[in-house]
Structure formats: C-alpha cells, structure tokens
Amino acid sequence: MPRRRRAVIREVAPDAIYNSTLVEKFVNSMMWQGKKNTAQGIFYDAMDKIRERTSDDPLKAFKKAVENAKPLLEVKTRRVGGANYQVPIEVPQNRRTSLAMRWIITNARTRPEKGMAEKLANELNDAANLRGGAIKKRDDVHRMAEANKAFAHYRW
C-alpha cells in the first residue's frame, strides 16, 4: 500500500483550435520527449486530412473514434489459493478514455503509411468506422473478459 496521499488529478486546459480537453489529452499522450508543438502539428495535420477526405467535422470523427475504441471490460490477474485467475472487471470512465487514446496512438505508429499525420488520420478514420488496430485491441480485451466470465465472482 502506498504511504503517500493519492495523487491529485489535475484539469487539462482545452486546446486552442478545437477548444476540447479530449484533444489536449490526446496530444499530451502522443507527445514524445516534451515536444508538444510537434505533437500538435501532427494531430492538426491529421485532422486536416480527415476534413479533406470526408468533408465532415473532424472533431466529430475524432470523438467517435475514441468512443468506439473504449473498452467496457478488462481482465485483472487475481491470486486465489495458489492459482492466478484472470478476473473480468468493469473499466472506470477515465481509464476507458486513456486506454482508447493509447491504443489509437500505438496502432497509428505501427501502420505502414508514410508520415505520422497520415498514419493517425487513417487510424482515426478506421476507428470511427469500427475497424483498424485499436478496435481489434478493444475486441480482444472484450473477448478475454468474456472467456473468463466464470471467474467474475473473484472480483474485489
């Protein structure tokens, strides 16, 4: 058990262009080595590419992509009587969002396209249309929770 107090969750200021805290959190989680301007440039380029392709509001597509990638259940390992069980638990709301954003970013980085903005635009577009790596990861997590439903009574 930690001996310190629980860390205070700080509010994130909304971004300048879309006035959205979700966008700012996404940019912060995409950032490497404190290079926020680079991360913002990549994100806004990706949003411009989405706007060109779909001629729709890119913020709406972004929110839909994050919403589609959110997991409802996940498994946590619990040790009971010398055996380890994968116990399905419900995911808290803030963890759902952070997992969805992390999966989108990770899968965008592994895509074969040229340039991160292009990769991110394609991954967001795929996630908004219920396909792509982030959605596959969410489905895998849900499948794992479904397979271990028998151990749900070990929940704590």
Swiss-Prot record:
InterPro entries: Ribosomal_uS7, Ribosomal_uS7_bac/org-type, Ribosomal_uS7_CS, Ribosomal_uS7_dom, Ribosomal_uS7_dom_sf. Keywords: Ribonucleoprotein, Ribosomal protein, RNA-binding, rRNA-binding, tRNA-binding. GO terms for molecular function: rRNA binding; structural constituent of ribosome; tRNA binding. Signal peptide: none annotated. One of its GO terms (biological process) is translation. GO terms for cellular component: small ribosomal subunit. Pfam families: Ribosomal_S7 (PF00177). PROSITE patterns: RIBOSOMAL_S7. One of the primary rRNA binding proteins, it binds directly to 16S rRNA where it nucleates assembly of the head domain of the 30S subunit. Is located at the subunit interface close to the decoding center, probably blocks exit of the E-site tRNA. PANTHER family: RIBOSOMAL PROTEIN S7 (PTHR11205). NCBIfam families: rpsG_bact. Part of the 30S ribosomal subunit. Contacts proteins S9 and S11. Belongs to the universal ribosomal protein uS7 family. This is Small ribosomal subunit protein uS7. The lineage of its organism: Bacteria, Pseudomonadati, Acidobacteriota, Terriglobia, Bryobacterales. The gene is rpsG.
